[in-house]
Each structure stands twice: as structure tokens, then as C-alpha cells.
Amino acid sequence: MLHEVLYKHLDGILVSRLYTEDQFVDLFSRTIPESNTVIASQLYKSYEENDQRIIEKIDKLIDNKLSLIRVELEREQIEDSISLEEVNKLLHSIDDMLQQHLNQLNIELDNKNTKLLKYAMELSDIEAIDTSMYDNVAKLITDMETNQPSS
């Protein structure tokens, strides 16, 4: 595509692209009436050879530049690939750290739940004692009010 764009541009500049040999010789003869058509023809052929060399050099320059661009793009893709690999490793590392932290939090939560359950059971025992004591005190008060000996 780049070559095509360049060729369109060269079509408006290079003599061999602007004119056929006959057109050039005719134009040359009309512009310089005392000129020889053989000289005009040789001059056109010289232009044609020069134009061809220019086109070849430009093609080569474009191809070289495109090749350099491809190499650079491939290098960047490799760097991006390496970068993606590094990012992937970092993500795995972060995932591992988060998993370890989550495991630690689960262990701490289990420990707290165990302590809370133990505390609840102790409270339950105390509550049973309190209820029993309350019942005994209530009976004692009732007995005292009725003047009955407590048991």
C-alpha cells in the first residue's frame, strides 16, 4: 500500500511516468525546434533509467524501513509478552498472599468462634447456677415470710 501511494506521487514527478517516449520526443522537438529526435530519444532513455533507479532505491528504502518497523514491533511484542508474564507472576503472587491471609483470617475466626462458644457455655453454666441460686433465695424469702424453716 505504501508503495502504491508513493508510485502515485512519482507519477506526477518522474519524466518516464509523465510521458511515453514518443510524447517526450514530440514535446522536446516542439520546445527546442533545432533539436535532434535521436538526442531527445536518448535523453528520454536516460531519464527512464534514472527514474527506474530512483524507484528501485525508494522501494528498497521503504522495504528496509518496513522491515525495521516489523523488527521493532516484534521486539515490543516480546517485551509486552515478557511484561504480561511478569504481571501474571505478580498476580499469582498476590493471589497466593491473599489466600494465605484469608487462611490466617479463617484460623483466627475459628479460634474466636471457639473462644466465644466456650464463653457462651461458661455463661450458660453460670446462668444455671444463678437460676438455681435465685430459686433458693426466692424459696428462702418465701419461707421467711411464712415462717417456715428453710431446707
Swiss-Prot record:
Source superkingdom: Eukaryota
One of the GO biological process terms: cell division
Keyword Cell division assigned: yes
GO cellular component, one term: kinetochore
Keywords annotated in UniProt: Cell cycle, Cell division, Centromere, Chromosome, Coiled coil, Kinetochore, Meiosis, Mitosis, Nucleus
Coiled-coil ranges from the UniProt annotation: 44-64, 102-122
Cellular compartments annotated: Nucleus; Chromosome, Centromere, Kinetochore
Keyword Cell division: yes
Function as written in the Swiss-Prot or TrEMBL entry: Component of the kinetochore, a multiprotein complex that assembles on centromeric DNA and attaches chromosomes to spindle microtubules, mediating chromosome segregation and sister chromatid segregation during meiosis and mitosis. Component of the inner kinetochore constitutive centromere-associated network (CCAN), which serves as a structural platform for outer kinetochore assembly.
Subunit structure and binding partners: Component of the inner kinetochore constitutive centromere-associated network (CCAN) (also known as central kinetochore CTF19 complex in yeast). NKP2 interacts directly with OKP1 and AME1.
Family statement drawn from the similarity comment of this UniProt entry: Belongs to the NKP2 family.
Protein name: Inner kinetochore subunit NKP2
Organism of this sequence: Kluyveromyces lactis (strain ATCC 8585 / CBS 2359 / DSM 70799 / NBRC 1267 / NRRL Y-1140 / WM37) (Yeast)
